[in-house]
């Protein structure tokens, strides 16, 4: 466990590569240029501990489902929440394995643990753990949770909103999850031990495509294809763009349209080059999705911390393709695609 905790990596390194790359101040450079005139500066955000803890909420008013409004901050989805009386926003981040809270607001809590976190460009700082009494949002309540405590000030500064922390599938994997980006809604539905809805009054979610979920962690991986080759993608609602591993087969990389390059600068002194472009040959099942934005970068550290080979990440552009239903108990992932005019 300690070794896995030392292999933490920042998903927000990838998230904010995308966000900053997309800023209007970026100079579009020809790919043949060997020196980019724009540097991407990364945060000190460490990846949360790789633990398999999950929590089940209490539903108020004896309800069997809840619809949670998702606010937008750029390409991030936010949930308004109250944590031990503190009101603010949680980033909906399915790439985070556990609950992560902002040290700005929870620094006075009793801390345990303390390991060195690793980012793409090297060690970037320690992570401590705290316990919180309760988290409330949209009529549901969680009690007695553990959370990693890190500095998330860079997200607040970048987006101009109060960020209490990050929340992912660990808080909802015992429920049926419906993510509707178009209508900015997250719906959670009570299910039994077999994954069936406890109340059938809600209409069943109809999918255009269904895929079996592999593994048993709080991180969701989706199988897709590029250039006819099967690839393993992390489904990440907080990734502001997609990502493809720079170690991918040449036949895969050749399908990408490279638009520009930027310099990736981490918390340390090391730098690396990141390419930004579009995916032209992505398929999930027999469904082709073209021209999604992506970055091309090394994902070896991400594979290490997840314990599985990670060929890419599917983020904001993928989420715009439809409505998603996830049932970890049944091990089912489904998509109902939006009509082309709706995307």
List where the protein language model places each region.
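Pepsin/retropepsin-fold aspartyl endopeptidases
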Residues: 2-343
């Amino acid at each position: 466990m300690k070794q896995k905790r030392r292999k933490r990596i920042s998903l927000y390194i990838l998230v904010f590569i995308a966000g900053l790359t997309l800023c209007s101040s970026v100079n579009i450079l020809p790919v043949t240029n060997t020196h980019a005139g724009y540097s991407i500066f990364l945060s000190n955000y460490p990846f949360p501990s790789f633990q398999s803890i999950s929590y089940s909420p209490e539903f108020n008013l004896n309800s069997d489902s809840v619809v949670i409004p998702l606010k937008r901050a750029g390409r991030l989805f936010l949930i308004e929440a109250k944590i031990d009386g503190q009101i603010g926003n949680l980033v909906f981040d399915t790439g985070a394995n556990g609950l992560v809270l902002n040290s700005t607001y929870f620094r006075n809590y009793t801390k345990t643990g303390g390991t060195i976190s690793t980012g793409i460009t090297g060690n970037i700082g320690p992570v401590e753990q705290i316990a919180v009494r309760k988290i409330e949002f949209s009529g549901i309540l969680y009690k007695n949770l553990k959370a990693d405590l890190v500095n998330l000030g860079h997200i607040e500064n970048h987006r101009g909103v109060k960020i209490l922390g990050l929340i992912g599938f660990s808080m909802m994997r015992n429920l049926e999850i419906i993510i509707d980006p178009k209508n900015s809604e997250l719906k959670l539905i009570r299910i039994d031990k077999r994954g069936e809805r406890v109340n059938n009054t809600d209409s069943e979610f109809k999918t255009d495509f269904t895929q079996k979920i592999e593994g048993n962690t709080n991180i969701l991986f989706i199988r897709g294809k590029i250039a006819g080759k099967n690839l393993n993608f992390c489904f990440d609602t907080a990734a502001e763009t997609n990502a493809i591993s720079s170690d991918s087969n040449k036949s895969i990389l050749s399908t990408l349209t490279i638009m520009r390059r930027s310099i990736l600068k981490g918390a340390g002194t090391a730098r690396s080059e990141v390419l930004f472009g579009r995916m032209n040959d992505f398929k999930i099942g027999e469904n082709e999705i073209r021209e999604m934005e992506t970055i091309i970068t090394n994902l070896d550290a991400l594979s290490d911390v997840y314990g599985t080979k990670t060929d890419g990440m599917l983020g904001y552009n993928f989420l715009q393709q439809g409505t998603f239903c996830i049932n970890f108990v049944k091990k089912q992932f489904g998509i109902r695609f939006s009509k082309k005019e709706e995307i």
